[in-house]
Amino acid sequence: MIMRIGFITLGCKLNYAETSTYERKLLKEGFEAVPWSKGADVFLVNTCTVTEHSDKKSRNIIRKLHRQNPEALIFVTGCYAQLKKAEIEAIEGVTRVFGATEKSRIVPAILAEVRGEKTDETKAPTFFPAYSSGERTRSFLKVQDGCDYKCHYCTVPYARGESRNIPISEIIPQAEAIAAEGIKEIVLTGVNTGDFGKSTGETFYELIRQLDKVEGIERYRISSIEPNLLTEEMIDWITSGTKFLPHYHIPLQSGCDTILKEMGRRYDTAAFARKIQYIREKTEVEGGPKVFFGIDVIVGFPGETDELFMETYTFLRDVVRPAFIHIFPYSRRAGTPAAERKDQVQDCVKTKRVQMLEDLCATLHQEFIEANKGVKEKVLFESTDRKGMMEGYTGNYIRVSRKYDPEMIGTVADIIL
């Protein structure tokens, strides 16, 4: 009998890449992947724990799966599974929970369970290589896992473990396999992507130089990189005519030096501003595309007064001027230094500040679009057919629509914005 399996992925693109890899491996073993809402014999839930809401969502989904599929096997992994393993094991219907360093055991454990065999508990690799597949244009390639930074608000280092990676020599074949599927764009992903090399004595700069040589891949994006790890040497090389696109996702978290210090971040606003300016100077030419900056910001960190928040607002509006702001209201996470502070910010204040930054983001994004009008760009068109239209993204991440043409799927075309 063919076993049906449903996959549920919560959280980041790294989780998405890992789930896609579990799916590929299980399909090779004869499983049939089905939408989880349709019911299945087995479920694999890949959880997130970045906020308290993420934890709650994970619990609710697990309970719903068991309620609707009381005979199904339910396996759980992901960041929430690492931090609260006993809590998840106590949920009715859960078959087994896998922590951050146990991901290589998941597929063998599922196979053993459905076949009635004994699970192999010998030591498994702590790094689980992964990349997403199934899309015809873009793949997320995991190059790094874990984080050695201990920012005062974050549980991810505890959920994902220490920074680790496999060698470049093992990553290149994965990129080549992605290219063999006809995929043109790879997004490099990790927990602290720029910290690549801790396990192997290599560097992220060495990695991207080798990936740039992979035939068949035309475009690369870096999903997120800490500002202190994005070096001028790296920027000089990226802007020298490589396959790496003018699209930078950089976590700022606060535009106030007081808050940055209390968060335990590794830079100040002056250093951040210099990095942004350097990238613009090295990338932008008159009449050419503008650089896309996506900036992460946390609002309502303990001790953030209205005046300190306005420092962030002003820094974003007048200095960084990103194309997009990823806004996160601070979430109190047990076990972190910030959670113990007495000067917590009220939720209603966080909501107001989120709205202010969302309004600013809308303005800045529109200005970014306007600044790129009339510019010649390359667009990688995707397969989605939406009311007779298809979409794609420029190198600097502007979404473009055109009449649907199946022959354009996965092709890079020149357009005038």
Specify the residue positions occupied by each region the protein language model found.
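Conserved SAM/AdoMet-binding glycine-rich loop
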Residues: 74-75, 83, 180-306
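Proteins enriched for Cys/Gly/acidic motifs involved in redox and nucleic-acid/cofactor modification
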Residues: 1-195, 209, 233, 269-286, ...
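Terminal RNA-binding accessory module
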Residues: 340-417
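Glycine-centered loop/turn positions within well-structured domains
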Residues: 104, 149, 194, 228, ...
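Short acidic, glycine/proline-rich loop/turn micro-motifs
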Residues: 260-263, 337-341
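Residue-level signal for inorganic ion chemistry
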Residues: 44, 79, 106, 188, ...
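Short strand-connecting beta-turns/loops that link adjacent beta-strands
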Residues: 38-39, 148, 253-255, 385-387, ...
